[in-house]
């Protein structure tokens, strides 16, 4: 298949007001998507968004395009990405559309699609939408125009779904939990889920104003959560990103618990309960400590390319059910069709309650190796990954690690960045090597 013009690894994303995230582009995208998706039968599309101020503008443009193509839009209002996937399935809709730029700042936004099964759209459907966008908009006859409606109980439906992934014989009674919703799409969902399961909940990041999403809070900035967990003497802290498809956690000592550790805890509990089917999938960025800890448990481990869509592809290829990225995207195919921060967190809380153990103690079976990640912004036509000097410095670093570490260079799928990752047993050496390689990349 030829390279896609607009769709990246996670839909279409960019700065609001700049191509492609403009009202006219999104209207045309809605029409093109409507024309392609209408061929499959259903006439309804679910549309959700996070809390960015630009969401109002973009959902209106999408609705106009879809209506012109003869499809009706059902709006959820602010809703986590995995909730839109769930509602798309339960409503038997033709597709779901999420307006979000996930963990990015408020002045970015994006559009991503879910199939009727609640999974990412196949590449060939995205390609068909791009091809349709090259054609002019030709509105259907007036009698065939789409309508717009609102799903008034969308939040309640998803809250009950999330609670259903927590064992009915258990409760969170006695647990004090601080939850950081990043002023994003989980702000009216996650605290209620935890409270209704019995926890004492302290909520932060639950006052979205359209411009404070992900700002010094949420899964990408844990400082506020760590401070609050310690101040409140809470048992655990949970942090989601702006659209709720990823999670980070904090133990009662204020220590960060990342996606690799969360994956380990869920896999180990699944093994103990006889529920784990096959192995688990991580990514090229997953810490070696995860691989070693799973090996000790006899759990097979496979690495996918970075990106939740690639984790999902590897799970399907292997016939396995559990995978995650260290950034906190956790996919539990026995419960969901896509990464779901709230559901993933509930599985860790299940392990805490069932084993009467703190999050800190549960994590003691896995030792993370020191890992340094340096992001280097690049521009221009030259490819730093093909540069002879960068290759030479990388090869030298691998020799210095003596087989007891890893070096990984890769391009970001969503930003003009080269990510330089080095891990190994010696933190000082790892830091030195990562910065040396980053300097070589900057010099290109």
Curated annotation (Swiss-Prot):
Q: Tell me the enzyme class.
A: isomerase
Q: Which Pfam families match?
A: PGM_PMM_I, PGM_PMM_II, PGM_PMM_III, PGM_PMM_IV
Q: Which cofactor does it need?
A: Mg(2+)
* Superkingdom, natural source: Bacteria
Query: Where are the catalytic residues?
Result: 102
Instruction: List, alphabetically, the InterPro entries matched.
Output: A-D-PHexomutase_a/b/a-I, A-D-PHexomutase_a/b/a-I/II/III, A-D-PHexomutase_a/b/a-II, A-D-PHexomutase_a/b/a-III, A-D-PHexomutase_C, A-D-PHexomutase_C_sf, A-D-PHexomutase_CS, Alpha-D-phosphohexomutase_SF
Post-translational modifications reported in the UniProt record: Activated by phosphorylation.
**Keywords for this entry?**
Isomerase, Magnesium, Metal-binding, Phosphoprotein
Which CDD domains does the record match to this protein?
GlmM
Per the record, what are the reactions this protein catalyses? Answer: alpha-D-glucosamine 1-phosphate = D-glucosamine 6-phosphate
Record's function text: Catalyzes the conversion of glucosamine-6-phosphate to glucosamine-1-phosphate.
Q: Which family does it belong to?
A: Belongs to the phosphohexose mutase family.
Q: What is this protein called?
A: Phosphoglucosamine mutase
**Organism name:** Erwinia tasmaniensis (strain DSM 17950 / CFBP 7177 / CIP 109463 / NCPPB 4357 / Et1/99)
**Gene behind this protein:** glmM
């Amino acid at each position: 298949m030829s390279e896609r013009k607009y769709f990246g690894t996670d839909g279409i994303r960019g700065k609001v007001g700049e191509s492609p995230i403009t009202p006219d582009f999104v209207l045309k995208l809605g029409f093109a998507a409507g024309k392609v998706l209408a061929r499959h039968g259903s006439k309804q599309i679910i549309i959700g968004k996070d809390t960015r101020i630009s969401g109002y503008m973009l959902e209106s443009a999408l609705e106009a395009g879809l209506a012109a193509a003869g499809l009706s839009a059902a709006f959820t209002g602010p809703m986590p990405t995995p909730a839109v996937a769930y509602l798309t399935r339960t409503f038997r809709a033709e597709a779901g559309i999420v307006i979000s730029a996930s963990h990015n700042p408020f002045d970015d936004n994006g559009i991503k699609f879910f199939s009727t099964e609640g999974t990412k759209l196949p590449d060939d459907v995205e390609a068909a939408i791009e091809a349709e966008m090259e054609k002019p908009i030709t509105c259907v006859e007036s009698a065939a125009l789409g309508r717009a409606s609102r799903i008034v109980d969308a939040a309640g439906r998803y809250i009950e779904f999330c609670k259903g992934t927590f064992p009915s014989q258990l409760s969170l009674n006695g647990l004090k939990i601080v939850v950081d919703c990043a002023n994003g799409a989980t702000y009216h969902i996650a605290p209620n889920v935890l409270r209704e399961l019995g926890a004492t909940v302290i909520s932060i990041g639950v006052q979205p104003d359209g411009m404070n999403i992900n700002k010094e809070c949420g899964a990408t900035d844990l400082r506020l959560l760590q401070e609050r967990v310690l101040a409140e003497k809470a048992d655990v802290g949970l942090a989601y990103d702006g659209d709720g498809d990823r999670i980070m956690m904090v133990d009662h000592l204020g220590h960060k618990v990342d996606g690799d550790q969360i994956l380990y805890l869920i896999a180990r509990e699944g093994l103990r309960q006889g529920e784990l089917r096959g192995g688990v999938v991580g990514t090229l960025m997953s810490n070696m400590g995860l691989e070693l800890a799973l090996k000790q448990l006899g759990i097979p481990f496979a690495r996918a390319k970075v990106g939740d869509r690639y984790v999902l592809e590897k799970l399907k290829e292997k016939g396995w059910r559990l995978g995650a990225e260290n950034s906190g995207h956790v996919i539990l195919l026995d419960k969901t069709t896509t990464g779901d921060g709230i559901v993933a967190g509930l599985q860790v809380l299940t392990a805490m309650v069932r084993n009467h153990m703190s999050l800190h103690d549960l994590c003691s079976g896995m030792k993370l190796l020191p890992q340094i990640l340096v992001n280097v912004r690049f521009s221009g036509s030259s490819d730093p990954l093909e540069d002879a000097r960068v290759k030479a410095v990388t090869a030298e670093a691998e020799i210095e690690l003596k087989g007891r570490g890893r070096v990984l260079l890769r391009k970001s799928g969503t930003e003009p960045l080269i990510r330089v990752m080095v891990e190994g047993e010696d933190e000082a050496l790892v830091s030195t090597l990562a910065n040396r390689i980053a300097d070589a990349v900057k010099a290109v």
